[in-house]
Amino acid sequence: MHRRSLLVALAVCGLAMSGRAARSAEPAKRISMLIGLPLDHPIVSARVAELYRLLAERGWVEGKNLRVSWRVWGASEVDLARGAAEVVAENPDIIVVGSSAETAAVLAKTRRIPVLFGTASDPVGSGFVRSLERPDGNATGFSNNDPAMSEKWVELLAEIAPATRRIGVVFNPHTTPAAGATYLARLRAAATGDEPAFETIQVTEPAAIDREIAGFAGKGAGGGLVFLPDSFTYRNAALCTAAAARLALPAVYPFDTFTLQGGLMSYAGAREETAEMLASYIDLILRGADVAELPVQFSRSFELVINEKAAAALGLSLPASLRIRAQRILS
């Protein structure tokens, strides 16, 4: 058994004696959530419902033995800092956050309350944990986009759009882990010869998305896009996919949120697996597990999602090799 899996199994066994019956007599546990998209967003509402279902399977029912509060931060770093301060002020049993940006904001406010991140691309390099196997602090969670995946995104882009000669790498340096440096280093190291040529496209406000991508497109033919994991572009997924479509640029995205909103293709850790792991860790921490001893988990399965309508609009045909490997084809 893998060491991380063994550690989790031991944590489960060690806490099982507490039992659900004993838990029901205790005051309701409290979770504070800090996320970047509104709860009425169709993708978010579906995933929230799934998380509640998984928690209920483990004996945690909202309104009975569980109280959950939500904070959605706005468009600026000031809003994010305010949201982080508010969830810390609630002094909950756990703070659950979505991305690296939210994790950093909350950890700047507390090193005491357990913090569980849903996705952090480089938790060690970002200073969230001391090591993956033993975080040794008040934060742990999951990572479904390792920097090594950037090479895979480029491979997929070349496969679906073989005429691509220039790749624009889109990200916000303020909300991407290490300002995108770890991803860019992997991309450049994987390049052979002069092609593809990489160009950074930095976007720091919604209005810049279309403008900066248009600037890249205007430099010549053969352009394509790779979007880095980034809470800013995630929040503005519809603007990102609309710009790529308007400018007829094939693009690969780091989350299926983009393909569900018209993007061409995404490759990332399976969302269902992340939800299952998140519910499992919430359960463990609420039952007394030490967050410092819960290893950071990585996705074990990955999902290739292709939007066939977007491909057709770009004049691209899906090769059989991609059709076979895709877990979902949206048509």
Where are each of the predicted segments found?
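Short hydrophobic alpha-helices and adjacent helix-cap/hinge residues
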Residues: 1-331
